[in-house]
């Protein structure tokens, strides 16, 4: 058998991993704690706020005062 033929042989595949034959035991049912107490009712909602009163009017926007500064005469 030449060296090349030896190289060409595929190595054996490992046997597949068989699952264990014994069935796993089912989990025991969870131990229920004491039943939950009934949910506490929240306090009743406070009365809603009255709508804001729109009687106060905003002061009118004042335009900026006109510029009082005078430019110095240009010197020639």
From Swiss-Prot:
The keyword Repeat applies. One of its GO terms (biological process) is keratinocyte differentiation. Its main location: cytoplasm. Not expressed in uterus. Residues 40-53 have a biased composition (Pro residues). It is found in: Cytoplasm. Pfam families: SPRR2. Keywords: Cytoplasm, Keratinization, Repeat. Residues 21-47 are annotated as: 3 X 9 AA approximate tandem repeats. InterPro entries: SPRR2. Residues 40-76 are annotated as: Disordered. Sequence repeats lie at residues 21-29, 30-38, 39-47. GO terms for cellular component: cornified envelope; cytoplasm. Cross-linked envelope protein of keratinocytes. It is a keratinocyte protein that first appears in the cell cytosol, but ultimately becomes cross-linked to membrane proteins by transglutaminase. All that results in the formation of an insoluble envelope beneath the plasma membrane. Belongs to the cornifin (SPRR) family. This is Small proline-rich protein 2I.
């Amino acid at each position: 058998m030449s060296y090349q033929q030896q190289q060409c042989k595929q190595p054996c595949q490992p046997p597949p991993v068989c699952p264990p034959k014994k069935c796993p035991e089912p989990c025991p049912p969870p131990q229920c704690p004491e039943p939950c107490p009934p949910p506490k009712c929240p306090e009743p909602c406070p009365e809603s706020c009255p709508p804001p009163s729109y009687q106060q009017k905003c002061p009118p926007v004042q335009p900026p005062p006109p510029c009082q500064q005078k430019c110095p005469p240009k010197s020639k």
